[in-house]
């Protein structure tokens, strides 16, 4: 297995950050043009990984849906940090902190409109890590 960490800077705001290019480059290099499985994992208790269409408004729609589902207010028992920080600790129950994508011939076998995104509602932690692992 080959594994490495990429760093993502969300800028201290809610974010759906596209990491597809980084994942594709890693998969190409790690696979040597062969087949296998890319596993994407966010080692944080307040972020997730989504396979979603990006750039056509879906990323904004996802953030809007999460704001409706997980409001940034004082209802949360886990109540340190910024207002609504507790919702970030609930996020991984809805958007898992991992995803696996087939790699065929060194290329990610994503659907036409699929991208790989790190989803982060935690405005208190603008610097994130994503672990990419290739099994082949």
Segments the model singles out, each with a brief description of its role:
Residues 1-136:
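Active-site histidine-anchored catalytic micro-motif
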């Amino acid at each position: 297995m080959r594994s490495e960490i990429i760093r993502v800077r969300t800028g201290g705001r809610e974010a759906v950050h596209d990491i597809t290019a980084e994942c594709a480059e890693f998969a190409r290099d790690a696979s040597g043009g062969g087949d296998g499985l890319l596993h994407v994992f966010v080692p944080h208790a307040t972020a997730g990984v989504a396979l979603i269409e990006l750039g056509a408004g879906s990323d904004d729609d996802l953030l809007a849906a999460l704001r409706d589902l997980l409001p940034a207010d004082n209802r949360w028992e886990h109540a340190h940090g910024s207002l609504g920080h507790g919702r970030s600790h609930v996020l991984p129950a809805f958007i898992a902190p991992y995803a696996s994508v087939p790699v065929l011939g060194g290329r990610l076998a994503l659907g036409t409109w699929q991208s790989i995104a790190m989803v982060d509602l935690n405005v208190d932690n603008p610097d994130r890590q994503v672990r990419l692992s290739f099994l082949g």
